[in-house]
Amino acid sequence: MSSVWGRILGDLRNPLFRQGYALMANTVVTGVLGMGYWLLAAHHYSPEEFGRGQAVITAMRLFASLTALGFVGALARFLPVAGRRTPELVLRGYGLAAATGGVAALGFLLTLPMWGKTYSVLSGFWPGLFFLGSVLVWAVFTLQDVVLTGLRRAPFVPMNNLVFGVVKMGLLVALAGALPSGGIFVSWVIPTALALIPVNWLIFGVVVPRHVKESDAAQEPPRLREIGRFLAGDFPGTLSILGIVYLVPVVVATQVGEATFGRFSMAHTLASMIELLAMNMAVSLTVEGSFDRARLAENCRHALRRAFLIVTPIIVVAILAAPLILTVFGSSFAEEGTTLLRLMSLAVLPRVLIEVYLSALRAQSRARMLATVQIGLAVLVLVSTVVLFPYAGVNAVGYGLLFSELLMGLLIFGNLRKILRGGETGTQAVTQESAGAS
C-alpha cells in the first residue's frame, strides 16, 4: 500500500499527471454528483418533465459549446506560451464563444416549431430569453475550466465543480414543488451563473497575473495569425466532434418521446463520463506538450499507459454492471439503456488512442491532420447512426460509435506509433513546424 501511495505522490510531482489526475477527479466528482442530480430529478419530477429537462439542457449545451469547446484545443495549446497576452487571449475566447453560441441559440429559437414538441416549452419571450442567457453563461463556464488547465491550475477545477454540483442538487429539490415544470432547467442554470463570479476572480486576480510574471519576458507570445492558422484546422474538426457529443442526442430527441429520451440520455451521459476520463489526460498532454515540446513522445507514452490503466477497469465494471447501474434510476432505464451503455463504454478503448493522437497533433500545431481525423470520425459516427437508427433505435448511437472509433483507431495507429517512438512525426516535426510558424 505504501508503495502505491509513494507512486501516486511521485506522479503528482509530474505536471502531466497532476493536471490529468485533477481533470479525472473532476470527471468523477461531476459524474457522481450528476448521477445524484438526475436520480433526484427522476424521483421529484414526472417522467415527461425529466425527459424535457434533459432535452433542453442538451440543446443549451450544444449551442454554448459550438465555439467554446472549439477553443479548448487552442487555449490548451497557446495559453502556456501566451505570456503578457494571456488576459487578451482569455477574454477573446470568452467573447467569441458567447457571441457565437448566442447567435446559434437565437436561430434555434426562431425556428422552434421545426424541432418538435419537446422544445415547445421554450416558446414565448421570457422562456426564450432565459434560454438565450443560459447559453451565454454556459459558454463562459465551459471555457473557465480550460483556462485553469492551460495555466497549470487544474486542481481548482474539481473544487469548483464540487460546490457547483451540490448547490445545483439543493436547488433542484427546492424547486420541485414551486416549479414542477421547468424546475430542472432553472436549477441547472442559476448555480452556473453564480459560479462564474468567484472562478473568474481567481483567474484574472491571481492565476493570470502569476502566469504572466513567471513567463519568459524574452519569449514572443503567439501572433493572432499563428493562432488563426491553428484554429483553421482544429476548430472545424472540434465542431465536428461536437456533433457526436451534443447533436446526436438532440436529433434523437426529435425522433422519440420525452420519457424514452430521458432513459436514453441517462445511459448516454454515463458512458460519456467514461469517455471524458480518456479526454482529460489528453488535454493535459496538449498543455505539457506546449510547455515542453522536447518531451512530447515521452509524455504521449505516459499518457497512453495511465489512460488505459484507469479506464479499462471502469469499462469492465460498466459492461458487467450496466443493468444494475441503470436500475438505480428505475427498471425502465435498465431495460432500454443497458445495451447502449455497454456499447458506448466499449468504444472508449479505441477513443483513448484517438485522443492521445489528437493531443500530440495539437502540441505540434498540425492543423490539417487535426481537421482530417476529427471530421472523418464525426462523419463516420453520424452516418452510421442515421443508417442504423431505423433498425436498432437508440442503440444505433452505440453501434455507430463503436464501429467508427474502432475504424479510426486502426487508421491512425501507424502515425501514433511513430510519435510514441519520437520519429519524424514526433519531436522533429514539432521543431520543424514551430520554426515554420515563426
Positions of the model-derived regions?
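Membrane-interface junctions at transmembrane-helix termini in multi-pass inner-membrane proteins
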Residues: 136-160, 291, 346-375
